[in-house]
Amino acid sequence: MFGLGHNSKEISMSHIGTKFILAEKFTFDPLSNTLIDKEDSEEIIRLGSNESRILWLLAQRPNEVISRNDLHDFVWREQGFEVDDSSLTQAISTLRKMLKDSTKSPQYVKTVPKRGYQLIARVETVEEEMARESEAAHDISQPESVNEYAESSSVPSSATVVNTPQPANVVTNKSAPNLGNRLLILIAVLLPLAVLLLTNPSQTSFKPLTVVDGVAVNMPNNHPDLSNWLPSIELCVKKYNEKHTGGLKPIEVIATGGQNNQLTLNYIHSPEVSGENITLRIVANPNDAIKVCE
């Protein structure tokens, strides 16, 4: 069974590859369905597809109350499913456990009675965090520059000018502030890069899975093996390409999932037709999925 949804195309695909920083603690990668605790980057928390899509929608609309109906639309109906309300309640409960969040005193997902759910934690993208830290480092270097200018411009006023030879060590003392200022500028440039490398995981990288009709099919590194799904993936991409030829042919397909008999194919097109980007989800075991794609 396929699930196609216009909202998922407009909202989700516009953020392919974007990672979110939650409360300056977790890095959330919706493409690989993972959470990484920034204090312990060795531990990777793998989210279920439902929990990941819930968090994805909440992260794109922080502090906004998302109705239960909107969540049902985004997580299930757009994928071709109709589930009862208990499925959403269970998925929210599981997501809170992954985030180590409390229902009584939530730090991340807050229940708004009779309305829905709200992500109350601070949310930034990795790019926004880098820009903020770079700006902070630049601000730190400014006071030193101002002081140096003040010292160099404060010349004593006197009616009598006396030409007195300056000791050699004056040159050494004058060059010291310049050296210190250069070091501060160098630190300001390198600090954001060092912070990013040490505290944030790298942008999602991919490895090749197969090539179908000249279209590369990739999967995230460290992703569970998708070998059993290869026949289904190849058939689905081939069928998709038959209906999308010429300039509408995708330039890349990213395959994720594979667990719980669910496979997600993200069809990515060229920038000129990026509006065609779409996510297709197959819900079947690898053998039956071939029949679905036909």
From Swiss-Prot:
Cellular compartment(s): Cell membrane
Matching entries from InterPro entries are given as:
OmpR/PhoB-type_DNA-bd (IPR001867), Sig_transdc_resp-reg_C-effctor (IPR016032), WH-like_DNA-bd_sf (IPR036388)
Membrane topology, Cytoplasmic segments = 1-182
Highest taxon in the source lineage: Bacteria
Q: Which GO terms describe its molecular function?
A: DNA binding; phosphorelay response regulator activity
The family database entries (PROSITE patterns) matched by this protein are listed as: OMPR_PHOB
User: Keyword Protease: yes or no?
Assistant: no
Which stretches are Periplasmic in the membrane topology? 199-294
Return the GO cellular component terms, semicolon-separated: plasma membrane
Give the transmembrane ranges: 183-198
Which keywords label this protein?
Activator, Cell membrane, DNA-binding, Membrane, Transcription, Transcription regulation, Transmembrane, Transmembrane helix, Two-component regulatory system
The main place the protein resides is membrane
Quote the DNA-binding region ranges, renumbered to this chain: 18-121
Entry's Gene Ontology BP terms: regulation of DNA-templated transcription
How does it sit in the bilayer? Single-pass membrane protein
**What does the UniProt function comment say about this protein?**
This transcription activator controls cholera toxin, pilus colonization factor and outer membrane protein expression in V.cholerae. It binds to the 5'-TTTTGAT-3' tandemly repeated DNA sequence in the cholera toxin promoter region. ToxS interacts with the C-terminal periplasmic domain of ToxR, stimulating its activity. It activates transcription at the promoters for tcpI and tcpA and this is presumably via ToxT.
Q: State what protein this is by name.
A: Cholera toxin transcriptional activator
Q: Which organism is it from?
A: Vibrio cholerae serotype O1 (strain ATCC 39315 / El Tor Inaba N16961)
